[in-house]
Amino acid sequence: MSIHEFSARLINGEEKALSDYKDQVLLIVNTASKCGLTPQYEELQILYETYKDQGFTVLGFPSNQFMNQEPGDHNEIAAFCERNYGVSFPIFEKVKVNGKEAHPLFQYLTSQQGGLFTEKIKWNFTKFLIDRSGNVVKRYAPSTSPIKIKDDIEELL
């Protein structure tokens, strides 16, 4: 099994098969607009712009499961990301990342790379690095600066 077997809705409502990202290195991130870590969008965008021509993509998945820090609707989220951080990487519709109603992709991601003490995602901006074959290679804590992941990304490109 790999992440290529899943699909999710882009922020514009279009269903997107993750198999469309075959042969790309991915960084999948659960995001939020009103979090102390929200400025990580800037570094995520830098990574995307730096490596997109080499087969790298960031996939952002907004979630409102952590202290309601992503309260906006899809249009508000998209506008926020574009206006404040110039985000041009794919942003998906808001999802749940924990619990029985968690999106199947996040159920899979957490089963492949558990966190410290638990598989559960503890906060916004947890990051999962995916290789070109769709395998979950590494999980990063919310506090990990996206730029610090650069070397790991380069190894997979």
Swiss-Prot record:
CDD domains (UniProt xref): GSH_Peroxidase
Family matches, as SUPFAM superfamilies: Thioredoxin-like
EC number(s) on file: 1.-.-.-
Recorded superkingdom: Bacteria
Top EC category: oxidoreductase
Endpoints of the signal sequence: none
InterPro entries per UniProt: Glutathione_peroxidase (IPR000889), GPX_AS (IPR029759), GPX_CS (IPR029760), Thioredoxin-like_sf (IPR036249)
GO biological processes: cellular response to oxidative stress
Keywords: Oxidoreductase, Peroxidase
Catalytic center residues: C35
Keyword Transmembrane: no
GO MF: peroxidase activity
UniProt xrefs under PROSITE patterns: GLUTATHIONE_PEROXID_1, GLUTATHIONE_PEROXID_2, GLUTATHIONE_PEROXID_3
Heme found in the keyword field: no
Similarity section: Belongs to the glutathione peroxidase family.
PANTHER family in UniProt: GLUTATHIONE PEROXIDASE (PTHR11592:SF78)
Entry protein name: Glutathione peroxidase homolog BsaA
Species annotation: Halalkalibacterium halodurans (strain ATCC BAA-125 / DSM 18197 / FERM 7344 / JCM 9153 / C-125)
